[in-house]
From Swiss-Prot:
One of its GO terms (molecular function) is mRNA binding. InterPro entries: Ribosomal_uL13 (IPR005822), Ribosomal_uL13_bac-type (IPR005823), Ribosomal_uL13_CS (IPR023563), Ribosomal_uL13_sf (IPR036899). The gene is rplM. It comes from Bacillus cereus (strain G9842). Gene3D superfamilies: Ribosomal protein L13. This is Large ribosomal subunit protein uL13. Keywords: Ribonucleoprotein, Ribosomal protein. It holds the Pfam family Ribosomal_L13.
């Protein structure tokens, strides 16, 4: 009888990928990046172990949203003070906080809890085309579709 392979946390080999967000749709990019961060693209995927790779996203300020979402989509946050509910449109987020916009989309697709926090540490998002991770020799990742 064969047993299912379970990866060990210290035996996982991690790669570094660079993803260019220029002209990419926010949701489609986010789902694929979340899948890479979890390690679901590997045959050694184990649900309770962090088997994913590191992802660097560049050009976050040039992300694309379909339809009228730039004006209609609203991001809410609360200051934890009475009456402290703040809101921003997607257009404001893309112009002023493009890194936070992408991080929110991707982290929402990761598991909640200890494993999700550990996985999200492997995400690096940059608004421009430059990143400080050249020493890791990241591979360019071509998105499907």
């Amino acid at each position: 009888m064969r047993t299912t392979f379970m990866a060990k946390a210290n035996e996982v080999e991690r790669k570094w990928y660079v993803v260019d967000a220029e002209g990419q749709t926010l949701g489609r990019l986010s789902t694929e990046v979340a899948s890479i961060l979890r390690g679901k693209n590997k045959p050694t995927f184990t649900p309770h172990v962090d088997t994913g790779d590191h992802v660097i996203i560049i050009n976050a300020e040039k992300i694309h949203l379909t339809g009228n979402k730039l004006n209609d989509k609203i991001y809410y946050r609360h200051t934890n003070h009475p009456g402290g509910l703040k809101q921003r449109t997607a257009l404001e987020m893309r112009t002023n906080y493009p890194v936070q916009m992408l991080e929110l989309a991707i982290k929402g697709m990761l598991p909640k809890g200890r494993l999700g926090r550990q996985v999200s540490k492997k995400l690096n998002v940059y608004a421009g085309a430059e990143h400080p991770h050249q020493a890791q020799k990241p591979e360019v990742y071509e998105l499907r579709g």
